[in-house]
Amino acid sequence: MINISTHISYTITHTKSGVRFCPRCAGSLKDRVIEEKIRQACTACDFIFYRDPKPVAGVLALKDGQLLLIQRGNEPKLGLWSFPTGYIDIGDTPAETAVREAKEEANVDVALDRLLGVYSNTDCTVVLIVYVGIIVEGVPAGCAEALDARLFAPGALPELAFDHDYRILEDLFGKDANPEKIEKKRQ
């Protein structure tokens, strides 16, 4: 059974993002029930527009038992704190993206230790691939995308930008109550 409120939200989201015409033939996209979901399909060529989540990679970077966070310089959640993340470019691996984002957003070089997990939910437009890493060089600093970058003790974290940030940190510190042991393992 299709939930009309979900349908309305879906339609508004696509209208706001400008997806109204077929990328194949430029015909109009109209909502249809396809595979038991409301999807947009072309009225001229029957192309189906699948709204797929974008892959994003990030890193929980540690140094001296502290966690690197960046203060977001853009919406959503401007001014709140999160860890370095970014969209995975074609030709890049998730691991390369995580390392690149730490450098771009926080001015640090990171050696990845391991994959922590893959995160998403039903209303999310991204699939987030998160690594644990060790800061091997650089001093945290802000940039155009990040107002600030700092190291925080696990017990003294600022307000985080997203609910999933808390889940992800719980996964890290639940498995590794002492973040320094990750760093020692790496040396």
Stretches with model-predicted labels:
Residues 142-172:
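NUDIX/MutT-family hydrolases
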Residues 82, 109, 151:
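Short aromatic/basic micro-patch
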Residues 1-76, 87-104, 108-137, 180-187:
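N-terminal leader/linker segments that precede catalytic domains of diphosphate-processing enzymes
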Residues 76-79, 150:
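A short local loop/turn or secondary-structure capping micro-motif enriched for an aromatic residue
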Residues 175-177:
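C-terminal terminal-structure detector
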